[in-house]
A protein has these predicted regions:
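Terminal connector regions
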Residues: 178-179, 217-264, 317-341
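Long, low-complexity ectodomains and other extracytoplasmic segments of secretory-pathway proteins
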Residues: 143-164, 245-271
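Extracellular Ig-like/FN3 beta-sandwich strand-entry sites
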Residues: 172, 188, 230-234, 308, ...
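Buried hydrophobic-core signal for structured, non-transmembrane domains
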Residues: 175-181, 237, 273-279
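Short solvent-exposed strand-capping/beta-turn motif centered on an Asx-Ser/Thr pair
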Residues: 180-186, 196-198, 278-284
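C-terminal accessory/binding modules appended to enzymatic or scaffolding proteins
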Residues: 263-306, 312-314
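Intrinsically disordered, low-complexity Pro/Gly/Ser/Thr-rich segments with frequent PxxP/GP/PP motifs
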Residues: 190-231, 293-320
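Substrate-binding clefts and catalytic carboxylate motifs of secreted carbohydrate-active enzymes
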Residues: 1-187, 203
Length: 341
């Protein structure tokens, strides 16, 4: 199914289809700036430059990425932020599909994402670039394909009024949570949810008991948030089993470009192989990077509420944690920092 991407359909279009098995679907993104620097000079770093278009197999795809960015994010303030936004788009596109297909296990019994890696440094459908750097999609796929997944089918402007200049009409602001269980044992636990404001203060919260059958799934009771401003609230959720969070996520009810983010004032510190990120407000798609782009973490490109979140550096052939506790070599960003505000 290539309606999303080649057909320029919105990500929510996946939810109109209930395939038995999906043999191929995907979405493009650019590699990180550190990879792009290896095949460009300063004057080439524009997505419509000759060099950037030559490093693109799909005709007119760079413009397609920009079109999807315009539907989702404020205009990126520079070339680097545009590359970053493209990776967030790619991860969200595939997540919309995979989570939907997993919510209807029994109808859909499998899906194959196009594609894993690249044979040259290029903008592509890959989740791992030519140099082995993980894009946002690769981190997201670790979670969306995990044996146990808590996911959310949200309803709001995203699926009912994606274009703000259409005639006013009522918007259903609600959510349906689902636990997918691909293990051979029932999953017994608790789903906890919180409806939060941009400053991470809680509007309302609740919990549901879960008993998801082996190789099956379970829908949670419908969550009705009508009366809430979709630009001012977001939903966070987690599945707790035996005291451990085994799956979690968050969702907006409008496009990120319209959400009323508060400045998260992100900061990062490093101690050995432990990276700690601090946020003063809700931050979406938080990414920690190094200047040379070879940092690999146990998780990245994550949403986080106000507070701290820790990540672990995973040593690779090009990188070891030893002697890397110099904060100046690291940077952290989120959707908030991608645009001039």
């Amino acid at each position: 199914y290539w309606g999303v991407w080649h057909g320029s359909e919105p990500f929510t279009a996946y939810r109109s289809h209930h395939y038995r098995f999906l043999s191929e679907f995907g979405f493009q993104s650019f590699p990180a700036l550190q990879t792009v620097k290896r095949f460009t000079e300063d004057g080439d770093r524009n997505i419509f430059s000759r060099v950037m278009e030559m490093h693109q197999r799909n005709t007119a795809a760079n413009g397609k990425i920009l079109n999807y960015i315009s539907q989702t994010y404020l205009y990126p303030k520079n070339f680097d932020e545009l590359l970053y936004c493209s990776q967030l788009l790619q991860a969200d596109a595939i997540r919309y599909g995979v989570e939907h297909f997993r919510r209807f296990r029994g109808t859909c019994m499998g899906a194959v994402v196009w594609q894993l890696n690249d044979i040259w440094p290029v903008a592509s459908w890959a989740s791992v670039d030519y140099y082995g750097n993980w894009k946002a999609l690769q981190y997201a796929e670790k979670k969306m394909f995990a044996p146990v997944l808590l996911s959310c089918e949200e309803h709001g402007e995203i699926d009912q009024k994606p274009f703000v200049n259409t005639l006013p009409h009522p918007i259903d602001v609600s959510a349906d949570l689902h636990v997918a269980n691909e293990t051979g044992e029932p999953i017994v636990g608790t789903v906890k949810w919180s409806l939060c404001r941009p400053d991470s203060s809680v509007v309302k919260e609740g919990a549901f008991e879960v008993n998801a059958p082996a190789y099956g799934g379970q829908w949670m009771p419908h969550l009705d948030f009508n009366g809430q401003d979709p630009l001012e609230v977001h939903l966070t959720y987690e599945l707790v089993v035996d005291g451990n969070v085994v799956s979690s996520g968050s969702t907006l009810f409008c496009a990120p470009k319209h959400y009323h983010f508060a400045d998260p004032k992100l900061s990062v510190s490093v101690d050995g192989d432990t990276v700690t990120v601090t946020a003063e407000n809700f931050a979406k798609s938080v990414s920690v990077e190094t200047e040379n782009g070879v940092l690999r973490l146990d998780d990245n490109f994550v949403d986080m509420e106000a507070g701290t979140k820790t990540f672990r550096i995973l040593p690779t052939a090009d990188f070891t944690a030893k002697g890397t506790g110099v904060s100046g070599a690291y940077r952290v960003r989120s959707v908030y920092e991608t645009a001039e505000r």
